Amino acid sequence: MHPSVVRLVKPRRPERITSPILPPLPLYRAILRAHHRKLPQELRYLGDQYVKKEFKDHKKIDNPLHIVGFLTEWQDYLKQIDGGSWSHGKLSKDDLDKMSPEQIGQLHELMEATKKIGEESI
């Protein structure tokens, strides 16, 4: 084929903009490795415990939409940790409005735990 014709041919399937979702176990291990490489010791312990609890709690989920949502959010978290943007992250009002009361409670507990760690290191 001529080079000009090749440019006119469309791909059979659209290109994927986002990266594919990692399976649960490799994602879990990658998060723990990222914690080890990127987080301070105190935050790493807190983060590891939280990740272990969340993955254990979601182990028995059957709904594919919940599984995809869970893995997608944790993969986004992994990108934040690897990219170093975790320390500058802010929660928008829209994100907060989407949370259930239980999630807001978990967020508050996490905030209190990180404050205690910050006070101990001073």
Curated annotation (Swiss-Prot):
Residues 1-47 form a transit peptide. One of its GO terms (biological process) is gluconeogenesis. It is found in: Mitochondrion matrix. Keywords: Chaperone, Gluconeogenesis, Mitochondrion, Transit peptide. One of its GO terms (cellular component) is mitochondrial matrix. Its main location: mitochondrion. Plays an essential role in the assembly of succinate dehydrogenase (SDH), an enzyme complex (also referred to as respiratory complex II) that is a component of both the tricarboxylic acid (TCA) cycle and the mitochondrial electron transport chain, and which couples the oxidation of succinate to fumarate with the reduction of ubiquinone (coenzyme Q) to ubiquinol. Promotes maturation of the iron-sulfur protein subunit of the SDH catalytic dimer, protecting it from the deleterious effects of oxidants. May act together with SDHAF1. Belongs to the complex I LYR family. SDHAF3 subfamily. Interacts with the iron-sulfur protein subunit within the SDH catalytic dimer. This is Succinate dehydrogenase assembly factor 3, mitochondrial.
